């Protein structure tokens, strides 16, 4: 049997990781400024993480949600305190797409509506509802194209209010900082106006924090820079530092019903242990604060590089979620960074470098990256 070939791959086999570095099967070291799509939060193979998962695996890896799992309760309590959402409820699943699916289902269950507003260039996942609110026709199959979603420009409050006033919108789903969309940022004025309009018209506000959340922006959640409190918050990626996990933070206004939502693997013992290890390291190593401090330094250094090299036309983002907009396609730049400078970055669109490193990134790592990027930009 062959793999179903849907991923355009770099010819590199990564076999080892530590902190912000990874190594291939030939022993070549790489600086990791992408963290596997913003998944790696506390660094590759953090010793506390490895120890906790190993110990848990020696006891119990999995049992079903038909019995008590005190690790789930502990995680919900810890996450509530860390994020400032102690009064919310927590539903555990396996991925970001699944988190968005369940958030949208909860909203629709509660207000009985079916229409959703989503931001242009949004990406919320590849499963049924999640892909429908994703603004990319290439990945929406006919079976998913049900006409439930209206895509609107980011930060155009008037356009959103006009749609909400129709009184039939189930939910608005937004990323405070767009990921695949290119690190575009929601403004405070738009976010607060949207929240007020949602409350006025009986619409639920969902914040997708799967990529921009979990400390990456320099606050626990990126929407906390905007002064809003969403009805539903979706998390994944950094929550498990590579272990598949997702969740929905659910406001107290939602009343749970037996059988309403469910999952086989979600919230399993290993996943909860991974998430608890992440929170331990967040607290011990002050990683949210580090993301803010080192992120500001990264953005400042990219803007200095922009002054020296005209290929960078704009620097976007916050914390350790940063986009460098280029006046040339990113393809050659990324290829040279990987194959010649041995540095991983991501991309968005056709001309944006997306930088999503582990939150343990240091200023020395930033200086190292800027040097490698400058070398490449001089050559292209």
What feature does the model see in each segment?
Residues 1-380:
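Conserved N-terminal phosphate-binding loop of PLP-dependent enzymes in the Aspartate aminotransferase
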